[in-house]
Amino acid sequence: SAEDAMRLVDRSREPFLIRTALNTTCEMSDGKYFTRFAFMNDGSNGPGWWGEKNETTKETQHYQLNKWRILDKWVEKYKELDPDLLVTSSHATEHNLEMPFSVGNLKADAGRLYADFMTREYLNGTSHPRVYFAAGNCLIGNVDNDPNSMAVGWLSGMNATAMVGYVVTTWYGRNGWGGLKYWAANAGRLTLAQAIYLNQQDMLHTEFGWYPEMLTVDYPFSAGAFAEDSEFKKLFRQATGNLPTKDQKGFVHDRDVVVLYGDPAWDVKLKNPAPLGYKVDFKMKGKQCVVTIITNEYFDGALMKGGKLKQEHVTDIPFAYYFPTLLQSNVKFERSIGKSLRLRSNKR
């Protein structure tokens, strides 16, 4: 509605630091980015388990839980935490989120979400800014021109100020998990939109490195599940002269199918659990721009590469930096001196 749109705009006017979270993935289950936190494991076929952390416990405490009660626990902690951030990854469609798979269900109804218990339990929104990150769910970001869609429910009834999600079925996971990895690895430094954008640029750079022509190949979603593989191989071979690897197919599949709803200018960040291990200095010297990375005793090279978050979907990520001023497109890397990178360009 127009009211929902204005609320989204109003709540993204000021910077916001994520402090509380509710997570249904094994990733980030240590809760180190949050002051108060709870998670449920919704992807296991075995016994369920959950954990929580607060100002008193400091570290996440883990507990076993019958998987049939995971949704009950999620609803309980949702109401208790009123979380700034929600992260999910289990099976979903435009109209429901299974939590866990085939057992519990969140469903959408006219702009609201409800837990599908014996008696429906509708969930209330929040009075503060909120991010919903559907890192690995199929289809949940697809509004599908339907007021009963999950995306409308998250943005309206659950009052998400920003939402990230897939608009198609997902099997490769590079785009959704990659965005989360960039955001978490750069906690306190990158906003949500910056992380999503940099992950996209990383994917495009990787594709260009394989074959520049890959960037002209669009995944044939309209071919249908039974024909899309053969159709993609045909399109890929026509463009590159080669058959695709699984990774190349996955990159093209994922390239343009994750949506960020919300104001991309919103300054919303994760809280860094420790002092940032480096700072970046930028100077212009004539036609040279000098970027210097200065590390300190808190520096963690593994964290800069992504901290192994969802490594099976997203390998190590590179260091990324937003220049404070616009550079011309013909920037050339000149040389590295110690911890400095020297680029030659004319500043606009």
Q: Where are each of the predicted segments found?
A:
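Cysteine-dependent hydrolase recognition
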Residues: 1-348
